[in-house]
């Protein structure tokens, strides 16, 4: 469960305002979450040691779906392991996945889209659906809320609105260059230059 003290923080800029004592209290928790995102997570499921991938962990831990938080399903675990194999195999260009309705695939794929979008530099990620309006609904009803629900430490710098209608831009917001601010040597903020 996400600690209440951290849930108040919305961006890394909020985190930077706190003192080292506060940061020291939470740095292990944050590093553990990054480790689980990258390497996956082992847990006991009915007394059976069970591994889930980092992508599956992000889906279960940080994705809210239409009924609340997703439940663990063995079929999803197998799907995510197979998906990691597809990503690791340089000969693979993706997968064809036949599914039934109400299987959670739209939320799983939206979760993966946000997960990849928040760690990848210089990427353009998209949604393909049977119609443009269906893709837009998936973006506004699934992708954006998943991104919004991420804790501050997984959120890169974002340009634009907090609930965008057409694009999530993980880049430094543009600012107007004038004679007065041309020579300012402010702290450089680095963005991913990635958009969904």
Where are these regions (language model features)?
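Phosphate/NTP-binding elements of NTP-utilizing enzymes
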Residues: 1-196
